Amino acid sequence: VSNEPLIPELPAPGKIREMKTDPLFGATVLTLDNGIKVVLKHTDFKKDEILMTATSPGGSTLFGAKDIDNLKVFNDVITLGGAGNFSATDLNKVLAGKKVSCSPSIGLNTENVNGYAAPADLKTLFELVYLYFTAPRMDEEAYTSFENRMIAQLKNLELNPMVAFSDTLTKAIYDNNPRAARITAGDFKQISYPRIMEMYKERFADASDFVFTFVGNIDTDSIRPFVEQYLATLPVKGRAEKANPAEVPAICKGEYTNIFKRALETPKASVVNFWSGKMEYNLENILTATMLKQILDLVYMEKVREDEGGTYGVQTSAQISSFPEGQTFLQAY
């Protein structure tokens, strides 16, 4: 298996339609003849590493209610079968000794491919990208093994009373929206492996609106042949897509309090306070939220743990989301 090439046959290379320099970051921006954009930024932080990220608008919000359970395991399942002519096990054998990784995934409002490689293994990274777009592979045996492991883990997890606490919190915050709920053992009755792979092919059937970004020890002249061979030949349909904001779980408005009791081996009380509001998504607000979290951590550590001795600690989080609109979240636990 290890002697077989990852890609037995390749189409004729595509072409770079346009090349320009980004004035802000000094990156090289390529537009390929199939519509894909490629951003190349040379850095000297690590000589043995090139990072890659690729994104396209769309994401899980483009699927309806019937696929909610499938989406819960989507990212865990899509590479179980490997790619091309290689099972996941055989693919790992082929990649043994190489510094390379490539992972497709779907987010709330994007499709993504993330990866990295040492400069010497950069061609392999491009080959993996090409395979995950053009030749995803199913493996029913691998999926059955995954399903059995997950069901056993989830049944064991659901014995933990704190899971009930977390589930209740999620239901309260998102007004019992099924898209926000975690996966349960019972969900596997509705999950379909063939449907997930069908969804995957649908989302990655059109590469024309993807932007690939490579950062690291890049030589532009050396990487261009890989771009032309493996990215400029990806399938395209010219779809103009954007995520569907109507399918994003909305945070419940107004004040809500939920107090419930559950038997524990070691009695304790857990309290979560959650606040949300509208806020513009920009760098200033992101930094402000980060500093707020750090300040609250210091204050709670001093007042609640050290002065009052009332708890082992308080955890906080503060963040801002940009989709479907600017929104801030603050949590103290």
Can you describe what each PLM-predicted range is?
Residues 1-65, 211-213, 218-263, 269-271, ...:
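Proteolytic maturation boundary segments
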Residues 1, 46-79, 83-135, 147-155, ...:
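M16 family metallopeptidases and their MPP-like homologs
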Residues 103-105, 138-145, 209, 237-243:
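Surface-exposed patches in mature extracellular/periplasmic domains of secreted proteins
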Residues 296-297:
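Short Ser/Thr-interspersed hydrophobic loop/turn segments at strand-loop and sheet-helix junctions
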